[in-house]
């Protein structure tokens, strides 16, 4: 039988008074959960950092030396051309406008094999390392000595949606946990008032496959990514709706004294229930409500960029229309890491449409990639500099990936030199930066025209195994039992790329 509102518990004991309606009790107690959690957050001593959330893995890390403890993942939606960015192929200029040599007929997504096409941007060597980067990314060229470029990536699909799933989960089908979810499951979180895994989608739209790209899959729901908006209200329905007829100076609970009574009463109910019925599912649900309530204070604080200096905001490009959106995401990513978030994922580009809002340069590579690079180049370089200046890059891993590359020949009819490139899953480039890596280097190679990976080929399981290894996680030991199978991010594959580790 429920208790009446007037029966506020004292020291965890209760006494039965007049019954109230179940519907009224449930409505009232739901509001109380939020109030209780906020009260818990506000009651902390000044200067006391939020508590950590431990790993729930059966075989918790570290299994290996810990080189990094947090990750920023920059994902370029649509298929960034390696040939126009990080994989210099001088022979393409020599053979520009000629047919593909040899008798092999490549398999392409749209089935069109035009003439060979040179890159649209000049390549230059940058930094002390002499790393080749094209003029598509002049700002990234200025931080070339921070980059570890992998030029021999391969994927198993040339279709955007399954290829994007594979880049994030290791599998082409949906229903599997993404990298950020596995990391949260394995390492826990360094704060209990923000999620372990935060996603910053492109305001123009979601990536191919939508929100599945930050799904927990079969892992517990608390390990899914939590999407923030980078402008406006960061999260829908984070704050409870307030009735228009609530008098000034009062809350939806009534007077401030009534709200305090509610907090105390619900806290006592929770304690009593956990002592008598310690059910994990219910405790997990209560924890999720509590996290949401804590985020009512932590999210506005971490997303408020007004405390950043004008110089910092300008460096990230917040003062330019072309760079402001992604610049804000990059700056917010750094702030989230500072508050204890483990994994922040930024998507550059939305899904399909016309005009294109991603890196899918089928029709006009020069126009398409120039537009997208302008949005991200300056902010990403600023992020690397900022992390380095703050001493954070030594224990932070930055990933810059895409689902596949582009073909060295034009997407056009035979003997025609078109302006676009088709999808290429046989060879493309990604890069890493941060702690535990050899900087200013490239690993692996595609063939002379950039069509196929031919030297030290890297698969997504290899890439994911290396990321987990840098975090101190043995990818063969991070498992979750599901439907009779011990599942892993890397399935039964994957080798750590030892040659890129410092």
Residue ranges and their predicted role:
Residues 3-502:
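Ligand-binding pockets and gating/stacking loops
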């Amino acid at each position: 039988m429920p208790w009446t509102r007037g029966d506020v518990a004292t020291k965890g004991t209760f006494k039965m008074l007049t019954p109230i309606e179940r519907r009224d009790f449930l409505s009232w107690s739901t509001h109380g959960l939020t109030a209780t959690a906020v009260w818990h957050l506000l009651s902390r001593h000044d200067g006391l950092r939020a508590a950590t959330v431990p790993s729930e893995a059966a075989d918790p890390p570290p299994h290996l030396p810990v080189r990094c403890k947090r990750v920023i993942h920059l994902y370029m939606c649509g298929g960034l051309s390696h040939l126009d960015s990080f994989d210099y192929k001088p022979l393409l200029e020599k053979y520009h406008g000629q047919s593909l040599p040899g008798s092999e007929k490549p398999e392409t997504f749209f089935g069109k094999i035009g003439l060979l096409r040179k890159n649209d941007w000049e390549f230059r060597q940058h930094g002390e390392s002499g790393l080749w980067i094209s003029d598509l990314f002049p700002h990234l060229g200025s931080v070339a000595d921070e980059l570890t470029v992998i030029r021999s990536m391969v994927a198993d699909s040339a279709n955007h949606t399954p290829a994007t799933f594979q880049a994030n989960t290791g599998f082409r089908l949906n229903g599997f946990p993404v990298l950020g979810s596995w990391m949260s499951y394995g390492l826990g979180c360094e704060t209990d008032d923000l999620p372990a895994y935060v996603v910053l989608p492109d305001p123009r739209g979601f990536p191919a496959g939508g929100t599945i790209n930050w799904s927990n899959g079969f892992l517990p729901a608390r390990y899914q990514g939590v999407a923030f908006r980078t402008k406006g209200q960061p999260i829908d329905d984070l704050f409870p709706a307030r009735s228009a007829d609530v008098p000034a100076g009062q809350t939806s609970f009534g007077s401030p004294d009534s709200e305090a009574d509610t907090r105390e009463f619900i806290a006592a109910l929770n304690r009593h229930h956990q002592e008598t019925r310690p059910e994990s599912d219910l405790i997990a649900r209560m924890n999720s409500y509590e996290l949401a309530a804590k985020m009512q204070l932590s999210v506005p604080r971490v997303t408020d960029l007004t405390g950043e200096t004008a110089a910092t905001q300008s460096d990230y490009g917040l003062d330019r229309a072309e760079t402001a959106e992604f610049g804000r995401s990059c700056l917010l990513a750094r702030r989230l890491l500072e508050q204890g978030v483990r994994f922040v994922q930024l998507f550059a580009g939305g899904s399909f449409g016309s005009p294109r809002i991603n890196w899918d340069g089928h029709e006009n590579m020069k126009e398409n990639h120039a537009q997208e690079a302008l949005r991200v180049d300056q902010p990403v370089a600023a992020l690397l500099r900022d992390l380095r200046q703050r001493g954070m890059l030594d224990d932070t891993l930055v990933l810059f990936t895409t689902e596949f590359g582009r073909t060295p020949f034009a997407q056009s009819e035979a003997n025609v030199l078109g302006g676009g490139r088709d999808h290429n899953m046989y060879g493309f480039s990604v890069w890493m930066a941060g702690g535990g890596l050899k900087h200013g280097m490239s690993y692996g190679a595609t063939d002379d025209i950039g069509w196929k990976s031919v030297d030290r080929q890297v698969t997504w399981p290899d890439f994911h195994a290396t990321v987990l290894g840098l975090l101190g996680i043995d990818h063969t030991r991070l498992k979750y039992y599901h439907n009779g199978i011990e599942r892993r991010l890397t399935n039964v594959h994957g080798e750590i790329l030892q040659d890129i580790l410092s």
